[in-house]
Amino acid sequence: GKTEVSQFKENETKVQSDYVLTYTNSFDNGNHNLTATAGFTTYYNSLSRLDGARKQGVGLVIPNDPDKWFVSIGDAATATNGSTQWERSTLSMLARVIYNYKGKYLFNGSFRRDGSSAFSYTGNEWQNFFSLGGGWLMSEEEFMKDIKWLDMLKIKASYGTLGNQNLDKAYPAEPLLSNAYSAVFGKPSIIYPGYQLAYLPNPNLRWEKVEAWEAGFETNLLRNRLHFEGVYYMKNTKDLLAEVPGISGTIPGIGNLGQIQNKGVEMAVTWRDQIGEWGYSVSANLTTIKNEVKSLVQEGYSIIAGDKQQSYTMAGYPIGYFYGYKVEGVYQSQADIDASPKNTLATVTPGDLKFADVDGNGEITPEDRTMIGNPTPKVTYGFSLGVNYKNWSLGIDMM
């Protein structure tokens, strides 16, 4: 029989500190209103983990001492171990100003400087980000006062930059060494342990940056019972942080691979009313999105994923688009097979799928694979219904 001993310990620490100073004031009889904020934040995250296992014959007594449970006694092939330890931290300095004139001309601006330990080994740990926004409450203008059914109309626009440092690697610029391999040299042959990088390091690794802007409006109508909002947005993700799959047995790498663009329209409408002690609301929303990879590391480069290479990412196409054979229909008869381009992939019979000859060479070959689908939905929408009576409420959401 076998005796087994296992031990698992994990200790994770997360500490966040925020130090913020805010100044608020109004000038010129309340015509000018200002709020200014400045400060800095820190974030620290660490993890320490210890694994262990032991199987050994009943005749070999395991000392009742945790420090000796994993000493290499007995059959070494049955002993396992493992350990994980890492820490990461960020420091951010920030400032923000919010201003309005007479409550109808609106402005806000922010700036932050972020530093991340993830890029400290490449010298790119610091990056600046900012945002600007403005709005015009048109319904407060004198020339809009006579429109009785219009309660509020606001035009708004904004532009900003954000950063991303998140990867599933604690030290993305410093890969771990794995000793899962060995080499044999000499006569007599001697086995030497070998070490391999978990992934190729990148000395130029840096922050992923997102540039986003949007413009739109929102309005309340019919005594604030009807609310409508519409926005056009565009988001460009640059210096995309991603892992490059290994090719032909090579190990993967990590880098800033390129640029991705998302753009579209967001719309939402809500009708809300009160009848006595009963209230109800009906809402709907719709979002369109066009996703496109604008560039990768170099022209013609592609990222292939999936056990059958069915997911492709390359410039000019949606990210992770489905790659395969386009189906034209089903072979109806042997005569249909004989009259169609020859399928060199397999022997086909009536009832099998008929693939398109994309390259037009008269044969169905692997070169006929093309984009056959987009994993990113072009349109998403949802509905919600709500009813309330006194202190009771019921809501239904559908997407």
Predicted regions and their residues:
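Glycine-centered loop/turn motifs
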Residues: 308-320, 343-356
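Active-site loop/lid in soluble adenylation, ligation, and acyl-transfer enzymes
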Residues: 20-22, 372, 378
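Solvent-exposed beta-strand/coil patches in large extracellular/periplasmic or lumenal scaffold regions
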Residues: 202, 354-357, 374
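Conserved C-terminal beta-signal and adjacent last beta-strands/turns
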Residues: 281, 374-399
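Extracellular/periplasmic, surface-exposed regions of secreted and cell-surface proteins
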Residues: 1-315, 384, 390
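C-terminal segments of large proteins
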Residues: 325-326, 330-334
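Acidic carboxylate motifs that coordinate Ca2+ or other divalent cations, activating on Asp/Glu
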Residues: 361
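C-terminal beta-signal and adjacent terminal beta-strands/loops
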Residues: 148, 290-292, 320, 332, ...
